[in-house]
């Protein structure tokens, strides 16, 4: 079976699907039209599927023979972002544009979904080569993490336990035609915060009679910056940023309140994420008290897991994909400090998250993710399709045993580890029956 040749043959279909999804982007938790179209495409291939309410779509391909009894999960995300797309990318006019004002696929999820549909098409047409089971996993709301809980609850209820998971992200930080297959940390974990400082407002001429939340925030911000040097091990990366700041309306009035929000990114949850989280609360509340202020937490995203490739699975992927596509395709980029809900899949089941380069200056596809100039190099889709199919088929036939490295607890235990309250966990399981 010449997988790369099959990927080339299916590439026009993948491009067509990508352009459809790009022209009709939908925000997180609103991907109804997208999910409907994915279902239509799967049905047209003769693949049965189930729509997971608030989660996405799960389909199962049973091979002609059970082989070694293994299961591989292939995943794609499908939501867009609230970004106003430009008519041109970095080099000139785009091949397709969003038809939805203020919404665009600015992170490549349109390509991810299209590539998984292409892989599904090949696998369905060659079930005699599938010696085991393959799960197709189309996830809603990756950008805000709103789809993965319901998808995992569904997997739990159905007793679906893959031996390995595969995901891929189109990546502007890597040149087109290269596929990053790293051992260990590939994308970062995130701790998110949205906090309001409550002070005492007053006239701008008498700051001595006010407790300015702005002064309080300045001290908090400086402490956040210093944390990287004084509170966290210097041998692990940490980035901290504040992207939202709201306070006051005019220059001569000290406001009562100030709201700030941001994120911290890291690779090691235990050595960096949890220590930073604990320091954050102590520091914010301590400084607020010193400035005569109080704080309220509008939202807190507890430290998640990093995307971390299982070394044995990653080495296997490099070997088999190198054999299929050529070793010159394999690359070792620096880990990416962005975050991904795929980390939860990897925490349960060892696997690989590949970074597929799309940076092509001639085509103008090098803009950063979540940027209005972001665009995809469609020529690389065949590599992504071939990579997914190759990993799946060769893993089913191979000797990689991940049983000792799988999550030892339940899916509910995983949610608990992430700081999710029991009643919220229950809501995930209820949601999939709505």
Give, region by region, the residue ranges found by the protein language model:
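Divalent metal-coordination and catalytic microenvironments
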Residues: 21, 74, 109, 136, ...
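Short Gly/Pro-enriched turn/cap motifs at secondary-structure boundaries
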Residues: 49-50, 142, 183-188, 334-336, ...
């Amino acid at each position: 079976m010449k997988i790369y040749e099959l990927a080339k043959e299916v590439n026009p279909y993948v491009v067509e699907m990508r352009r459809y999804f790009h022209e009709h982007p939908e925000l997180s938790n609103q991907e109804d039209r997208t999910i409907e179209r994915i279902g239509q495409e799967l049905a047209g291939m003769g693949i049965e599927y189930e729509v997971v309410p608030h989660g996405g779509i799960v389909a199962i391909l049973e091979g002609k023979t059970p082989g070694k009894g293994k299961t591989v999960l292939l995943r794609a995300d499908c939501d867009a972002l609230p970004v106003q797309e430009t008519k041109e990318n970095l080099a000139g006019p785009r091949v397709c544009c969003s038809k939805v004002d203020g919404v665009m696929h600015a992170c490549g999820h349109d390509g991810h979904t299209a590539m998984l549909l292409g892989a599904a098409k090949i696998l369905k047409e060659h079930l005699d080569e599938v010696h085991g089971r393959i799960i197709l996993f189309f996830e809603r709301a990756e950008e805000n993490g709103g789809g993965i809980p319901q998808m995992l609850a569904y997997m739990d209820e159905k007793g679906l336990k893959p031996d390995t998971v595969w995901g891929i992200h189109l990546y502007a930080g890597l040149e087109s035609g290269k596929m990053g297959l790293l051992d260990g940390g590939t994308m970062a974990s995130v701790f998110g915060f949205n906090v309001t400082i409550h002070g005492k407002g007053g006239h701008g001429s008498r700051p001595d009679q006010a407790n300015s939340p702005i002064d309080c925030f300045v001290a908090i911000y400086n402490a956040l910056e210093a944390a990287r040097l004084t509170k966290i091990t210097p041998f692990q990366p940490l980035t901290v940023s504040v992207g939202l700041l709201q306070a006051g309306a005019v220059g001569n009035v000290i406001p009562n309140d100030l709201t700030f929000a941001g994120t911290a990114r890291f690779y090691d949850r235990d050595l960096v994420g949890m220590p930073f989280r604990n320091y954050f609360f102590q520091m914010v509340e301590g400084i607020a008290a010193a400035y005569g202020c109080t704080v309220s937490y509008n939202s807190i995203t507890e430290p998640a897991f990093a995307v971390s490739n299982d070394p044995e699975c990653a080495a296997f992927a490099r070997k088999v994909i190198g054999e299929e596509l050529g070793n010159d395709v394999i690359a070792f980029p620096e880990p990416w400090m962005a975050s991904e809900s795929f980390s939860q899949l990897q925490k349960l089941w060892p696997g690989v998250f590949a970074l597929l380069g799309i940076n092509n200056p001639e085509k103008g596809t090098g803009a950063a993710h979540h940027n209005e100039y972001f665009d995809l190099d469609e020529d690389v889709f065949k590599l992504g399709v071939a990579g997914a199919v190759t990993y799946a088929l060769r893993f089913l036939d191979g000797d990689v045993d991940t049983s000792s490295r799988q999550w030892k607890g339940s899916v509910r235990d995983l949610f608990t580890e992430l700081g999710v309250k029991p009643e919220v966990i229950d809501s995930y399981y209820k949601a999939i029956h709505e």
